[in-house]
Amino acid sequence: VFKDNTITPTFKAGNVSPNEQPADRKGLWLHAFRLMCQASRMAATYEANRSICKYVHSTSRGHEAIQIAAGMQLQPWDCATPYYRDDSMMLAMGFTPLELMLQLLAKTDDPFSGGRSYYCHPGSRALDRPLIPHQSSATGMQVIPATGMAQGIRYLEKHLSDSLAIGPEGELPVVLCSLGDGSVTEGEVSEAWQSAILWELPVIFLVQDNEWGISASSDETRVMDAYEYAAGFKGLKRMRVDGSDFEDSYAGMEAAVSYVRKERKPVLVHATVPLLGHHTSGVRKEWYRSEEDLSIHLEKDPFPKLKARLLKSGVTEKELLDIEKEAQDYIEAEFDKARISQDPDPRTVKDHVFAPAAVTTEKGNRSPENGAKVMMVDAALHAVEEILQQYPEAIFFGQDVGRRLGGVFREAATLAEKFGDHRVYNTAIQEAYIIGSTAGLSAVGVKPIVEIQFADYIYPGFNQLVTEISKSCYLSYGKFPVQTLIRVPIGAYGGGGPYHSGSIESTLLTIKGIKVVYPSNAADMKGLMKAAFLDPNPVIMLEHKGLYWSKVPGTQSAITIEPDADYQVPLGKGRVVLQAHPKDTQKGKTCCIITYGMGVYWATAAAAAYPGQVEIIDLRTLFPLDEELVYQTVSRHGKCLILTEEQLNNSFAQALAGRIQLHCFRSLDAPIFTLGALDLPAVPINMALENEMLPNPQKVKAMIKDLLAY
């Protein structure tokens, strides 16, 4: 029932008074009571075995009613993103206590993460239960991937219905996103809600409000609760429920799920609940909560409430005691099974960092006969166009890539006109959503290409990149690699200034679980773009703005013959740009330059002064690195310069120098030289200052001279 922007729950059986008991309702209550008994006994068992349950965990004590009510609504074709306190919800969705306990104790048979992640951090593709992608601990971060799943479902529903999982009667899927009240103040929650409303996505945001965020009370941390906050989001339906009352919770969740399943629009459910357990096993309630506060919360315990309802319906005290005893015996037996299960084999610790790459060898024709020359920006454009033509599950979105502009560098020009606004479209200025939504899109089978407009503005998306995307494959034990291609224009290009000229590769390369490519010419741009899209893992493609049109002097060779449509360059393979003369190498008169991006052109220009004495390697991929090519080249020449556009101190270039010296020490005739930008906080807008800061052919030439003379 709707009034304005709010929902008033009703039962399917109609508006009945609490004293009227439809026949099916008692069975529902008994099922909920059994699950509640199991959840309560699980929490008690963990508390009684603290030395065994040594890894940090939270339980649902106090939240059981709303969680069970929510979990009961979901079907195997639905999706969910529970948060770390949702073990009752997991039980209601059909997961067993043993499965949860195996994760609690970090056992090898943990079905979610293989002993790698915390309790109630599920990742499941079980066909008989809702789809649950990798869940992180970062509060509120799951809201963006959850909305991304809804975004993907909506796309499949409208345009690729054969690829969408639906119910036996054609029931459409929904996404349930569960979160605590303390996480609602995260800015990324707002980004997700805006997107869900704007695009009319089928997602339920369930906020469980116990008025505590670890030791911070609600009056310390917010001016309004989630229900009041949601009033400011035009078009977001909302409701309040008493999350400690199973009947009210079930009615509310039933209404919310029914609405979203039919209307395909988002809903917020604000459930008030008591917090009866600890924040976590490591942050105990008695450390920061008063006896008065604890007693107030205890009065709202959902367990005696449901028990009283069942007694009133005619269930006997003995029947309920039997259910409690049954739960106790069952949980104790399951805990014993989990306790004696095997720990993970330490030799598996490196498994599932990435899914196997799809492209492992160079394919297609790099320089077809009579082929036309193409600039890098157009090579990228054509690559994406060919991808969209071949793969209907591919979409492309980001700031200004849609109709009208087609990218601030015209790198997406005409794509929306050719493929429609449902496949190529603009987003708001929300880097976190652009990046993080791809985790959800990938989970449901959509293959996103997204763009961050400038490398300098990627940082708001780092939460999602680090907590959700990079760890997903590893912590889901290979079940949820995130297939996403993130395009990032990068680098200085003459007067771009401090917020449009930055280089960020060293920062990106500290994140494990992502791949980073950096083409320096049109052919590699196209070949790497194809391989990056096909890779089942997250790939960031750094695209140098100064090379897009080859307007920077000395970069004309970035324009190449356009490769065939099937051309692919495997990630992790470098390229020899310039070879030294073998005779000079034998005489010890040569050196090599290891570089990428704009460095290729600085190195090439400088090497002209030393014909036959310089070999240049273009890395093309920064991770995974072509170590074999690098080490073999350095060992052959004995002298090496690593050249980067980045500020040098603590950079990827310096780290690579250390690795080379470790692996090639016996072959070196000189220390590894490095050259990069001056260690300044930003690239100045004045072009004379920019030129002074950055490397250039003259600086490279001087360093080659010193290196050869060493």
What are these regions (language model features)?
Residues 1-67, 72-73, 271-419, 429, ...:
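Conserved acidic/glycine
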Residues 41-199, 217-235, 498-500:
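Cofactor-binding active-site loop characterized by glycine-rich and histidine/acidic residues
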Residues 47-53, 117-136, 170-176, 211, ...:
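Glycine/charged-rich beta-loop-alpha catalytic/anionic-binding loops adjacent to active sites
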Residues 64-65, 130-340, 402-482, ...:
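Thiamine diphosphate
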Residues 82-84, 140, 146, 178-179, ...:
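Short beta-strand segments
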Residues 490, 494-539:
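Internal gly/pro-rich beta-alpha loop/helix module
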